[in-house]
Design a protein with these regions (language model features):
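Small-residue (G/A/S/T)-rich helix-start motifs and N-terminal tracts that mark the onset
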Residues: 1-82, 88, 182, 193-349, ...
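Nucleotide and nucleotide-moiety/phosphate-recognizing core
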Residues: 36-128, 136-158, 344
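Short, glycine/acidic-enriched loop or turn micro-motifs at the edges of active sites
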Residues: 125, 129, 162, 354-356, ...
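Internal gly/pro-rich beta-alpha loop/helix module
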Residues: 121-123, 128-222
Length: 503
C-alpha cells in the first residue's frame, strides 16, 4: 500500500476528479458517506455529537458528515470556524446544504467562540484542518484544540488530527495538535501515523476507501509503502519436490560471548525455523556446549578465544553471514569484526554489538559486502548517524546512510522501516508490544540470515523477514497475550507464520 507525502495527496485528488470524471463536491460527498458509515458502526444515534469544522475542505468533509449523520437520526451540535469570512468552495456548498437540516444545531463562529460543555459521553468530530497543513496552529485555532484536548470527550479526527503535519513535525507546536482517540484516514495512511511520538495524537487509525482512482494511485510514484499480506506472500519462493538441503543455502552465524550464549541460540533457532539448508554457528568455547545442546540441528565452529569473538573466519563456503547477537564489545572483538568486514565477500546481516562497534568505526560501514543488511533499533542507528530529534529525522538519516553506504537497513520499531539504497522505505504492519523484550532482535537476525542464504534479494529478504517475524509475534500474542510473551514464543510460532504466508 502506497503512502504519499501530503504534497502528492492534493494531486491525487485532482487526478481522480479529472480521470473519473467526478466533481470535487461529489468526491467530498463520497468521502463523507464513508465517514458516516464508520461513525455509525461505532456509536448509536443517541450519542451526543459535536462537530468542529474549519474553513477548508476538511471542514467541508465535517459539514457533509454532519448532514449525513443527521439523516441517520443523530443529533449534532456543529461549529464552523469562519473567522476570516472565507470558506473553500466545497465547504461553502456544504454549509448551504446543512442549513435547516433537522437534528443539527449549527453555529458559525466569526468572532468570539463560546465553547459548549463536553461530557465524557460526548463524541467530538475534529474537522478543523486536514493533511494540507504546513505550519503550526496558533491563536484562536490553537485555543480550540487545547479546549478539545482538555475535555473528557472521545475525539474522532477526519483524515488527520488537526495541527498534525503529514510527515515532518520537528518544528511543530505539539500542545496545539488535537489528541484523537480515532483517526479516520481517507483512502491511504499518512507517514506521520507510523512514528511513535505521534501516537498520542493519532490514536487508533482506520482507513476508509473513498474511491480514489486505483490507476492514478498505481501510476503515481512514492518512496514510501506499507507492506500488505498478499504482497509479502508473493515474495515467497516455491520449494521443489526434489530439493535438498544444498538448495536452501549455507549460513554462518557469528555470535555469542561469555554470558551471552542465549543470543546465539535464539538467532540460530530462528534461522533454522526459516528454511535455511545448513547453519554453522561460530562461537567462543564457553558457548559451544550450550549451542550444541540447545540447537542440535546447527553445527558449531570454535573461535580461538574461550570467551569472545577474537578472530575473523573464512566465509567463502557460505551464502550469507550474520554477526552481532551477544557478541560483546571486547577490544579483540572489535579488531576481529573489522577484519571480518575486510575479508568477507558474502552478504552480511549486522546486528546488536556489531552495530555498536561499527558506531565507533563508521568508515567501515561502506566497506560491508554488497547486499548487506543492518538491523538497528533507534539507539543503535543513532550511534551510526548521530542524535535525532524524532522518528522522521531518524528515518531520513537512515535513508542517507543506506544510499551512501549501499546497504539495506531494517530500522526496528512498532512499524519497522526497511530502507533501501535507492531511498525506498517499506513499513511493516505486523507485530505487537509483547515483542518488546530482550532477544527479539536476535530472532529477526536469524530470519534475515536464513532468507539471504536461500538467495533472496536483500530488499525482499528484509521485507519478508520483518513481516514474518512480526506475524509470528502476533500468533504468539493471540495464543497467550502480550504480557507473558518471551522471544522463545516468537521462535516457536515461526512455522505457523510461514504457513500463513504460504496459504
Amino acid at each position: 500500500m502506497k503512502i504519499f507525502p501530503t504534497t502528492s495527496i492534493k494531486q491525487l485528488d485532482a487526478d481522480t476528479i479529472e480521470n473519473e470524471p467526478i466533481a470535487s463536491i461529489d468526491l467530498m460527498e463520497r468521502a463523507s458517506r464513508a465517514l458516516a458509515r464508520a461513525i455509525a458502526e461505532r456509536w448509536e444515534p443517541d450519542t451526543p455529537l459535536t462537530v468542529f469544522a474549519g474553513p477548508g475542505n476538511n471542514g467541508g468533509d465535517a459539514l457533509a458528515l454532519a448532514r449525513l449523520l443527521a439523516g441517520k437520526g443523530y443529533r449534532l451540535e456543529v461549529y464552523l470556524f469562519n473567522t476570516k469570512g472565507t470558506l473553500s468552495p466545497d465547504c461553502e456548498t456544504n454549509k448551504e446544504r446543512l442549513a435547516d437540516v433537522p437534528g443539527v444545531d449549527f453555529h458559525e463562529v466569526t468572532t468570539q467562540f463560546v465553547p459548549p460543555v463536553l461530557a465524557a459521553d460526548h463524541v467530538v468530530i475534529d474537522g478543523l484542518f486536514g493533511s494540507g497543513l504546513n505550519k503550526a496552529l496558533s491563536g484562536g485555532f490553537a485555543a480550540v484544540v487545547k479546549y478539545i484536548n482538555a475535555s473528557p470527550a472521545t475525539v474522532v479526527s477526519i483524515d488527520i488530527p488537526s495541527g498534525l503535519m503529514g510527515e515532518d513535525n520537528t518544528y511543530n507546536v505539539h500542545t496545539n495538535i488535537v489528541r484523537a482517540h480515532l483517526t479516520l484516514s481517507l483512502q491511504l495512511p499518512k507517514l506521520a501515523f507510523l512514528f511513535a511520538e505521534n501516537e498520542p495524537y493519532v490514536g487508533e487509525w482506520q482507513l476508509l476507501d473513498i474511491g480514489l482512482s486505483e490507476d492514478v494511485i498505481h501510476d503515481m510514484e512514492t518512496d514510501f509503502c506499507l507492506l500488505e499480506h498478499e504482497d509479502v506472500s508473493a515474495l515467497l519462493k516455491p520449494r521443489s519436490r526434489f530439493a535438498h538441503k544444498g538448495n536452501f543455502g549455507r549460513a554462518l552465524l557469528i555470535a555469542g560471548s561469555q554470558g551471552m550464549a542465549g543470543a546465539s541460540v535464539l538467532a540460530a533457532r530462528a534461522c533454522l525455523r526459516s528454511g535455511v539448508g545448513l547453519l554453522t554457528v561460530h562461537v567462543p568455547f564457553c558457548n559451544n556446549f550450550i549451542v550444541q545442546t540447545s540447537v542440535p540441528e546447527a553445527m558449531t565452529e570454535l573461535d580461538i578465544s574461550d570467551t569472545c569473538f577474537a578472530a575473523a573466519t573464512d566465509t567463502d563456503d557460505y551464502q550469507a553471514v550474520a554477526i552481532g547477537p551477544g557478541l560483546g564489545k571486547a577490544a579483540e572483538t572489535e579488531a576481529a569484526l573489522l577484519e571480518q568486514i575486510e575479508i568477507c565477500q558474502t552478504p552480511m546481516v549486522v546486528d546488536a554489538d556489531a552495530l555498536n562497534l561499527l558506531g565507533e568505526k563508521r568508515n567501515y560501514i561502506g566497506r560491508l559486502p554488497k547486499g548487506s543488511i543492518l538491523t538497528p533499533h533507534p539507539k543503535e542507528l543513532e550511534r551510526l548517524v548521530g542524535k535525532c530529534q524524532n522518528s522522521y529525522e531518524r528515518l531520513m538519516k537512515a535513508r542517507e546512510l543506506a544510499k551512501s553506504a549501499g546497504v539495506h537497513i531494517i530500522l526496528k520499531g512498532a512499524y519497522s522501516a526497511i530502507v533501501t539504497p535507492a531511498g525506498k522505505c517499506f513499513f511493516n504492519p505486523t507485530g505487537n508490544p509483547g515483542m518488546a523484550t530482550g532477544g527479539s532482535g536476535d530472532v529477526l537476525t536469524g530470519v534475515v540470515l536464513a532468507l539471504l542464504a536461500q538467495g533472496y534479494e536483500p530488499e525482499k529478504a528484509a521485507c519478508l523477514a520483518t513481516y514474518v517475524h512480526g506475524l509470528a509475534g502476533d500468533v504468539a500474542c493471540k495464543k497467550q497475550g502480550a504480557v507473558g510473551m518471551t522471544v522463545g514464543d516468537i521462535v516457536a510460532c515461526l512455522p505457523l507464520a510461514w504457513k500463513m504466508l504460504e496459504e
